[in-house]
A protein has these predicted regions:
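Adenosine-cofactor binding site in Rossmann-like domains, unifying the SAM/SAH pocket
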Residues: 26-47
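NAD(P)H-binding glycine-rich loop region in Rossmannoid oxidoreductase-like domains
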Residues: 41-78, 89-91
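Active-site Tyr-X1-5-Lys
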Residues: 120-148
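Alpha-helical substrate-binding/gating segment
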Residues: 141, 147-154, 164-191, 196
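Mid/C-terminal beta-alpha module of Rossmann-like enzyme folds, strongest
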Residues: 176-226, 230
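Conserved Rossmann-fold NAD(P)-dependent oxidoreductase catalytic core, especially the SDR/UDP-sugar
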Residues: 84-120
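N-terminal Rossmann NAD(P)H-binding glycine-rich loop of SDR-like oxidoreductase domains
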Residues: 2-25
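Glycine-rich NAD(P)-binding loop of the Rossmann-fold in SDR/ketoreductase-type enzymes
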Residues: 39, 70, 74-85, 119, ...
Length: 240
């Protein structure tokens, strides 16, 4: 049996996922990054003082692989040390932590990855998110969600024809994540849709856009070839 947290705090509320979660769970707490900066533990601790919080859904992150290649220290501050701060806060509050990670933690050489498969990132963005996972694993009452999502309308004129993914529209992912939050599960959980190329995903999402093909060889940053996810545990524990 599942139930909603008494009080849910969401980090990264101004982002794509945050806006989608807010529409589904408007009674949760969505502090802005200016008042709840994950790189500033003292500020976070002051903000939660006097508030009853039993679950933190941590999605605040620096998520652009090419920009992280240019500025890896910012990724260290936000994605690794910021997550360490959130872990510390949850320990102090005795709150459950649900951490939004990425399918990119996998090497991408075969796809259909299970939760217990070996992780080996191919770019700095994914290494920084894996660093966050390592911090979260120090908590007993925590859940790591590996997923991939994008806007409800595909935003680009081209998409990778040679990269395989389990990506879903953010509105779908937000609902799936909240069901995972409400489940009370701990450990690692994969959240995603069917295995398909990013191009097939884009064309299914936005057929009127006539998205054209792009190759991973055409971009300057490293892209894993197949990070599709096995979601058997999600379907078994939570449902479709």
């Amino acid at each position: 049996m599942t139930s909603q947290p008494e009080r849910l705090l969401f980090t990264g509320g101004s982002g794509l996922l945050g806006r989608a979660v807010r529409r589904l769970r408007p009674d949760a707490l969505f502090p802005s990054s200016s008042e709840f900066d994950v790189t500033d533990y003292s500020q976070m601790a002051a903000w939660v003082r006097g508030r009853a919080i039993d679950t933190v859904l941590h999605a605040a992150a620096f998520t652009s692989p090419p920009k992280i290649d240019e500025d890896p220290l910012r990724a260290l501050d936000v994605n690794v040390l910021g997550t360490v701060n959130v872990v510390r806060l949850c320990k102090t509050l005795n709150a459950r932590l649900v951490y939004v990670s990425t399918d990119y933690v996998f090497r991408g050489d075969r796809g259909h990855y299970r939760e217990d498969d070996e992780v080996l990132p191919v770019n700095k963005y994914a290494w920084s998110k894996l660093g966050g996972e390592c911090a979260v694993r120090l908590l007993d009452n925590a859940l790591i969600l590996r997923t991939s999502f994008g806007p409800d309308e595909f935003p680009y004129p081209k998409a990778f024809a040679d990269q395989w993914t389990s990506r879903q529209a953010v509105s779908v992912t937000a609902g799936a994540i909240l069901r995972a939050v409400d489940s009370g599960l701990t450990g690692v959980l994969h959240v995603g849709g069917p295995r398909r190329t990013v191009l097939d995903y884009a064309r299914a999402l936005s057929p009127a856009l006539k998205v054209e093909a792009l190759s991973v060889q055409d971009v300057s940053f490293s892209v894993p070839a197949d990070t599709s996810l096995d979601t058997t545990r999600y379907r078994r524990e939570i449902g479709d």
